[in-house]
């Protein structure tokens, strides 16, 4: 049997593509454009795993398909190379993070090239390259000039082990850091913030303009968290103080029986009575140690302390005790709430715990047993009694505005983006703080502000980054003799990834971020493929920066990414014991088709789980490429199932994909190729071209491969293969298995040219139509024969054919035919006696 030698074929074609710059981005202005973007990777020390190529293969198939369809294709790759892991490694080993990063990039690039992706490497970007981050810094200076980057003393999520503050989005639900899983505490610090809140409404509205999964849009909508309601002002009894509360349910104001301020609220100390001062101070101290997520956990026990003061409910004059509690956050809304315990679960639990009044103001439920959180007509609410929710809200807002104690208000859950990091390995923030108290941005002519090389990269522990120790870089003097210090905080890893897709369009421009005409030509990105874990952070930040650049006239579109696709996760083979605990693969043996724990002998259940070093089930693509070839890996990952599904890795599936490619190789290299078309494959060939074209366009790669298999099976039944069909088939499979595609194309054409730009095959609609149909012949209601006849025969012709059939004649010999019922294209029923 003939098998192809992937170890010879794949490196040969990779060298050909590199030497000939086969995938250089097209510049023919008369052609349509197609911009296919992968989420660029962080080049970790571990290298690529088999999950990376799944998304990369999808965009590569689309890119190869669109090139063959006559598009200019921009399909680039680069490196999101700043970030904590390289710095952590450098601190642990004493090595330079830049060297470590460069080694990792070289390894990633080697692995990516071994998989045959059609990237235009002339456009490679690296976020740690000063020629790249010059423009990251330039964008920051524009944000600063527009008042969208500002300094503030804010309570931050401080991670002692990382020596830095992290953004809200980087804190996990259990109150630990996304990176490393370390404890997060709240600590007030001077920080750079970006005013993403100024764009909240546009970030929300423009989601309607993009073709993204609805689940991702919903995650962004929830994160932005738009609420329409009212601000209500409460006076503090026997003082000249007051505070404002935002509520989405101003109609329940008659049921507000107490108020809660965040422990950090500016009013707390001023209204706390002497006998409550110690308890309040203690509580504030404890609250400062908890993260926002830990504080707002619905399941946690409710805690709080009374300030000793009362607020006056403006609608009925009732006194309401003012408490502080950590479930109210200073950073959310106004940092104060009015509690309506009859109709809010959290308020109800708090009221029960501290024996506070519960007054129902909506009909329905038993508020002694539980909060009633559904809608009902208003009761115990004076001028709102008998009204429904919408009418009551409108009437209460009208009353608040007329009385001067409130107004209609829209708020957002979205907070400004905490942008500074107290670390070394990031873009320096291009700001100078002068001794006269002013601050200025570094002028464009002095950008990039290059990160200085230093051995001392440990966090200072003072809240400043290690750059505070690099004196000759840190200290500057103005022409007028005024001394200054450079900003020592660096940017987060999200900075470089918020605009990299723009730099690919014009990566070597030294005068500007990118040429306006080129941006007009290529934006927006046509397809962006990556993991759903970036739903909020990266995608929201990139959309924000893009909108700022749109307002500056730099980019011509409101949105960066027209279509987004999230590939699923490739799960590893793993095993569970009877307790549900996962068992590492090196502790498992297979006997008679079952799996057993090597140490305990217990029978285990196979259960796919996320690949991890601890389970020893990480599959390295290098090993797969060596054993089976890159084309096999590509075809297998696309054939596993729908691209957006999470599916377990299977060695058997991999072997199946390799066997299929061997069959393809044999079909083209051993079958007699002829210039004469017998017509036998007309229908299946044209069906295959149509199906593969449509399914690749819709990213249904698994069904496209299934159709290619149908063609191979049909072609193998014939003695000869029509040369046009052989070539067309090789073109169809080439985006999936590009090395094999090139090799077989040369076997058929000996052109010496790549298959990449050969026009995509077309199909003949008339050949898709069946000219023959199968009909059944029934005698006494039982099927006695099946006949293939020309389509659309008349009743008379059908009857004639049926009665002439040998089997039918044998059945009716010597019998009387009572009647014959013929249904064209379906059946002939013969009634005899």
Swiss-Prot record:
Keywords, ordered alphabetically: Aminoacyl-tRNA synthetase, ATP-binding, Cytoplasm, Ligase, Nucleotide-binding, Protein biosynthesis
Keyword Protein biosynthesis: yes
Top-level lineage group: Bacteria
Subcellular location: Cytoplasm
Motif extent ('KMSKS' region): 610-614
Assigned EC number: 6.1.1.4
Family that this chain belongs to: Belongs to the class-I aminoacyl-tRNA synthetase family.
Name by which UniProt lists this protein: Leucine--tRNA ligase
């Amino acid at each position: 049997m003939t098998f192809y030698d992937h170890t010879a074929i794949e490196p040969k074609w990779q060298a050909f593509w590199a030497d000939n710059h086969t995938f250089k981005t097209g510049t023919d202005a008369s052609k349509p454009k197609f911009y296919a973007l992968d989420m660029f990777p962080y080049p970790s020390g571990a290298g690529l795993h088999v999950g990376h190529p799944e998304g990369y293969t999808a965009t590569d198939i689309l890119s190869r398909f669109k090139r063959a369809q006559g598009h200019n294709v921009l399909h680039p790759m680069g490196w999101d190379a700043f970030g904590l892991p390289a710095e952590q490694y450098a601190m642990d080993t004493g090595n330079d993070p830049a060297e470590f990063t460069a080694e990792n990039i070289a390894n990633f690039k080697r692995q990516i090239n071994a998989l045959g992706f059609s990237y235009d490497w002339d456009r490679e970007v690296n976020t740690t390259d000063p020629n790249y981050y010059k423009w990251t810094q330039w964008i920051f200076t524009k944000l600063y000039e527009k008042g969208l980057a500002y300094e503030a003393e804010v309570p931050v999520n401080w991670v002692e082990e990382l020596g830095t503050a992290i953004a809200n989005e980087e804190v996990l639900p259990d109150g630990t850091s996304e990176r490393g899983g370390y404890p997060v505490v709240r600590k007030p610090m001077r920080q750079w913030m970006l005013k993403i809140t100024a764009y909240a409404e546009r970030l929300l509205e423009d989601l309607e303009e993009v073709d993204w999964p609805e689940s991702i849009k919903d995650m962004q909508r929830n994160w932005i968290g738009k609420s329409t309601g009212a601000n209500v002002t409460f006076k503090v009894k026997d003082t000249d103080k007051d505070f404002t509360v935002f509520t989405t349910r101003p109609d329940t104001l008659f049921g507000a029986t107490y108020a809660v301020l965040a422990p950090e609220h500016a009013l707390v100390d001023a209204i706390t009575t002497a006998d409550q001062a110690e308890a309040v101070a203690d509580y504030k101290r404890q609250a400062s140690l908890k993260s926002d997520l830990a504080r707002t956990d619905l399941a946690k026990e409710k805690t709080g302390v009374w300030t000793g003061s009362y607020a006056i409910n403006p609608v009925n004059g009732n006194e309401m005790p003012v408490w502080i509690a950590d479930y109210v956050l200073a950073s959310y809304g106004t940092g104060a709430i009015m509690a309506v315990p009859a109709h809010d679960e959290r308020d109800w639990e708090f009221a029960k715990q501290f024996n506070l009044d519960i007054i129902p103001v909506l009909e329905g439920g038993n508020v002694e047993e539980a909060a009633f959180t559904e809608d009902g007509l208003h009761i115990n609410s004076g001028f709102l009694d008998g009204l429904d929710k919408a009418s009551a809200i409108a009437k209460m807002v009208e009353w608040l505005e007329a009385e001067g104690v409130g107004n209609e208000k829209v708020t957002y859950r979205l907070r400004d983006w905490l942008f500074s990091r107290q670390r070394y390995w990031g873009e320096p923030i291009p700001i100078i703080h002068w001794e006269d108290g002013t601050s200025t941005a570094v002028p464009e002519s002095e950008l990039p502000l290059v990160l200085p090389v230093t051995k001392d990269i440990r966090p200072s522990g003072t809240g400043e980054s290690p750059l505070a120790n690099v004196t000759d870089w840190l200290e500057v003097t103005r022409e007028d003799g005024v001394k200054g210090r450079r900003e020592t905080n660096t940017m987060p890893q999200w900075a470089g990834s918020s605009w990299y897709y723009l730099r690919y369009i014009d990566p070597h421009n030294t005068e500007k971020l990118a040429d306006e005409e080129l941006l007009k030509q290529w934006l927006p990105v046509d397809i962006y493929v990556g993991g759903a874990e970036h739903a909020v952070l990266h995608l929201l930040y990139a959309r924000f920066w893009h909108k700022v650049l749109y307002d500056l006239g730099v980019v011509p579109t409101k949105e960066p990414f027209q279509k987004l696709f999230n590939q699923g996760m490739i799960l590893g083979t793993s095993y569970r014991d009877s307790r549900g605990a996962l068992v590492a693969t090196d502790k498992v043996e297979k006997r008679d088709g079952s799996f057993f724990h090597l140490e305990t002998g217990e029978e285990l259940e196979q259960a796919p789980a996320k690949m991890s070093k601890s389970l020893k089930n990480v599959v390295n693509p290098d090993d797969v490429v060596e054993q089976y070839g890159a084309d096999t890996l590509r075809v297998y990952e696309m054939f596993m199932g729908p691209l957006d599904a999470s599916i377990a890795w299977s060695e058997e599936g991999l072997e199946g994909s390799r066997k299929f490619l061997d069959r393809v190789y044999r079909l083209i290299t051993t079958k007699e190729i002829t210039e004469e078309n017998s017509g036998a494959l007309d229908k299946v060939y044209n069906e295959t071209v149509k199906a593969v074209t449509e399914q690749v366009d819709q990213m249904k790669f698994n069904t496209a491969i299934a159709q290619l298999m149908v063609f191979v099976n049909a072609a193998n039944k014939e003695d000869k293969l029509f040369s046009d069909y052989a070539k067309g088939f090789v073109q169809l499979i080439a985006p999936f298995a590009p090395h094999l595609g090139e090799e077989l194309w040369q076997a058929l054409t000996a052109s010496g040219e790549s298959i990449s730009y050969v026009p995509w095959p077309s199909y003949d609609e008339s050949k898709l139509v069946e000219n023959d149909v199968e009909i059944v012949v029934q005698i006494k209601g039982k099927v006695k024969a099946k006949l293939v006849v020309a389509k659309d025969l008349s009743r008379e012709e059908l009857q004639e054919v049926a009665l002439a059939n040998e089997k039918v004649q044998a059945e009716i010999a010597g019998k009387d035919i009572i009647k014959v019922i013929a249904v064209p294209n379906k059946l002939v029923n013969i009634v005899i006696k």
